[in-house]
Swiss-Prot record:
Residues that, per the record, bind Mg(2+): 80, 99
Catalytic activity reported: 2-[(2R,5Z)-2-carboxy-4-methylthiazol-5(2H)-ylidene]ethyl phosphate + 4-amino-2-methyl-5-(diphosphooxymethyl)pyrimidine + 2 H(+) = thiamine phosphate + CO2 + diphosphate; 2-(2-carboxy-4-methylthiazol-5-yl)ethyl phosphate + 4-amino-2-methyl-5-(diphosphooxymethyl)pyrimidine + 2 H(+) = thiamine phosphate + CO2 + diphosphate; 4-methyl-5-(2-phosphooxyethyl)-thiazole + 4-amino-2-methyl-5-(diphosphooxymethyl)pyrimidine + H(+) = thiamine phosphate + diphosphate
Keywords in alphabetical order: Magnesium, Metal-binding, Thiamine biosynthesis, Transferase
Nucleus found in the keyword field: no
Gene Ontology CC terms: cytoplasm
Taxonomic lineage: Bacteria, Bacillati, Bacillota, Bacilli, Bacillales
Protein name: Thiamine-phosphate synthase
Cofactor: Mg(2+)
Organism, scientific name: Bacillus velezensis (strain DSM 23117 / BGSC 10A6 / LMG 26770 / FZB42) (Bacillus amyloliquefaciens subsp. plantarum)
Record's cofactor remark: Binds 1 Mg(2+) ion per subunit.
Role, per record: Condenses 4-methyl-5-(beta-hydroxyethyl)thiazole monophosphate (THZ-P) and 2-methyl-4-amino-5-hydroxymethyl pyrimidine pyrophosphate (HMP-PP) to form thiamine monophosphate (TMP).
Length: 224
């Protein structure tokens, strides 16, 4: 296994869907399937918080979703659980600033994808130095999904990181919808992540497709 290239990582971040079983009232595996059919390019398994699965139920759910991702050929990333990622041979791990140490995580997972949440320029630089393949930056907009979210930043931090010549792949996080995604890409992000905008949508496939079309349109506009 070799480390993922930055160009490939940037493409995979385009429509970055995050979900746990407690983020939807529908069948969660079906929601992931529909999201991928609609254009999700990466999936992060985030099974935490009130009403989340534990133990064997959590493991079985993770395996089912991983199978869906494998069949579709998109990366399956696990949030903040290196042990589970290694056990399932996941494609990668995403950690927050209050989770595991990035350098220790990189050492533990080898060449798997490593994503790190960052809320200021110094955290981005530290993540890059520790071997992160991408950073998640935000919250860009107000969000209801993460009760412990940092202060809303808009797109200014993403712009500042790019102004400083930092080229690590970036995915925008927090309160992003298909209608407000364009400014995130225009600021310098390579993709956007979402939970409820797809997981709680009446039609997850259509919601994912709208994101996919908007991101494609925004990236095309930048390359002109």
């Amino acid at each position: 296994m070799t480390r993922i290239s930055r160009e490939m990582m940037k493409d995979m971040l385009s429509v970055y869907f995050i979900m746990g079983s407690n983020n939807t009232s529908a069948d969660p595996v079906s929601v992931v399937e529909k999201a991928i059919e609609g254009g999700a390019t990466l999936f992060q398994f985030r099974e935490k918080g009130s009403g989340s699965l534990t133990g064997e139920e959590r493991l079985l759910f993770a395996k089912r979703v991983q199978d869906v991702c494998r069949q579709a050929g998109i990366p399956f990333i696990i949030n903040d659980d290196v042990e589970l990622a290694l056990r399932l041979e996941a494609d990668g791990v995403h950690i927050g600033q209050d989770d595991a140490d990035a350098e220790e995580t990189r050492a533990a997972i080898g060449d798997m994808i490593l994503g790190v949440s960052a809320h200021n320029v110094s955290e981005v630089k530290r993540a890059e130095a520790a071997g992160a393949d991408y950073v998640g930056m935000g919250p860009v907009y107000p969000t209801e999904t993460k009760k412990d979210a940092e202060a809303v930043q808009g797109v200014t931090l993403i712009e500042e990181v790019r102004r400083q010549g930092i080229t690590i792949p970036i995915v925008g996080i927090g309160g992003i919808t298909a209608d407000n995604a364009a400014p995130v890409i225009e600021a310098g992000a390579d993709g956007v992540s979402m939970i409820s905008a797809i997981s709680q949508a009446e039609d997850p496939k259509a919601a994912a497709r709208k994101f996919s079309e908007e991101i494609r349109r925004s990236k095309a506009g930048l390359s002109r």
